[in-house]
From Swiss-Prot:
Signal peptide positions on this chain: 1-29
Residue ranges of every copy of the RNase III domain listed in the record: 48-167
Chain's role: Required for karyogamy during female gametophyte development, when the two polar nuclei fuse to form the diploid central cell nucleus.
Superkingdom of the organism of origin: Eukaryota
GO terms of biological process kind: karyogamy; polar nucleus fusion; RNA processing
Example GO molecular function: ribonuclease III activity
GO cellular component: peroxisome; plant-type vacuole
Protein name: Protein NUCLEAR FUSION DEFECTIVE 2
Swiss-Prot/TrEMBL keywords: Developmental protein, Karyogamy, Signal
InterPro entries (alphabetical): RNase_III_dom (IPR000999), RNase_III_sf (IPR036389)
Organism: Arabidopsis thaliana (Mouse-ear cress)
Length: 191
């Protein structure tokens, strides 16, 4: 009877040791496997990362940029409101820039400058196209993302998203002039 108890105890001990070694090696193997797995990144996420580099602004809340790059044809959570806000930011940027240079600028001249920058065909759609927004903006399958109005809406929405993300319009204005800056010289000559 004592040998039977000893044998059972020895068997339990050996089985316990076997399982503890096998679970340790399993954990070690699992850890090695987990270390090799890279986080999934969608093409859209990659495009958003590239866009942040292009505009020189890193979003704290990437969902704002996602929304800015989402057209109304794609989702109810879209860029319409951000675009309206972005339009006002762009108009403020132009007004601030040109009133600071010439406080006596006529309202007609200032209005013309604002119109030039806000014009869908000749300005914001070109800037949006230059940033490659036609390949980034999410639209329904029946919608052409390279359409000027869609590019312009996305371009404007970026600045609305930046202002919300930064908590200040100043940052959005700074990024706007950085992105649009090469074309700003042409506007100055319009004065």
């Amino acid at each position: 009877m004592a040998t039977l108890r000893f044998t059972l105890l020895l068997l339990v001990f050996v089985v316990g040791i076997f399982f503890s070694f096998s679970s340790v090696s399993h954990v070690r193997a699992t850890s090695e496997i987990n270390l090799r797995i890279e986080p999934f990144s969608s093409p859209f996420a990659t495009d958003l990362a590239k866009l942040q580099t292009q505009i020189g602004y890193k979003f704290n809340n990437i969902n704002l940029l996602r929304r800015a790059m989402t057209h109304a044809s794609f989702s109810q959570e879209n860029n319409k409101a951000l675009s309206i806000f972005g339009t006002h930011i762009i108009e403020t940027a132009v007004s601030l820039q040109f009133l600071a240079k010439d406080i006596d600028i006529s309202s007609k001249a200032l209005g013309r400058l604002i119109s030039e920058v806000s014009n869908v065909e000749s300005s914001c759609a070109l800037d949006g196209d230059r940033l490659g927004l036609g390949k980034i903006i999410r639209v329904s399958t029946k919608t052409d993302a390279s359409n000027s109005a869609i590019l312009c809406t996305g371009f404007r929405a970026i600045f609305g998203a930046i202002a919300i993300d930064a908590g200040t319009v100043d940052e959005a204005i700074k990024v706007f002039w950085k992105v649009h800056g090469a074309r700003a010289g042409r506007l100055v000559s319009m004065l």
